[in-house]
Amino acid sequence: MSMVFHRFDDRDQAARECHRVLRRGGTVCLRAATIDRAGSYAYVPFFARSSAILNDVLQSQTVIETIFTSAGFQSVCHELVRSEVAGSWGAYANKLALRVDSILARLSDQEFDAGLAALREHAATAPLDEPVVELVDFFVFRSV
C-alpha cells in the first residue's frame, strides 16, 4: 500500500483484512505519511493549516506498528525512504495546483490559493533543477 493508510476509516479492519487474505508468512509493504514527520513535508511551510490537518489525520510510526501487530503481523523492518515528489519547485507547484492531495483538499479555497501563491513565489527563486524531496516511512510486516 502506498500513501493511502491514513484514508481508511477503519485502519484496524484494513490490517485484519490484509491478514485474512495473506498466507502465513505473507508480506505487507506499507509506504505511509506519519505524524512523526508531518512538519517536514514540503508543502507545510506554504499552507499554514496543513500542519494541523496532518496532525489530525495521520498516525504515528508506533500506532501503525501496533495496528499491524495486533492484526497478526510481525514487524520485519521500518525505514525512512527518500521520495522525490517533484523534479523542481515549479513542477511541485503545478502538481499541487491540481488539488488532488487529500490533506490540501481540506483547505478552503482562500487558504489553498494563498498557499499556492506562496509556493509559486518560492519556486520563482529556487534553483530550476532542485528536486523536492520528502522522507516517507516504509514498513514491512509479515503474517504470523
Question: Which ranges hold each PLM region?
Answer:
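Structural motif corresponding to alpha-helix initiation and N-cap regions
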Residues: D12, Q61-T62, A86, T125
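Short, glycine/charged-enriched secondary-structure capping and boundary segments
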Residues: Q13-R16, Y43-F46, A91-A93
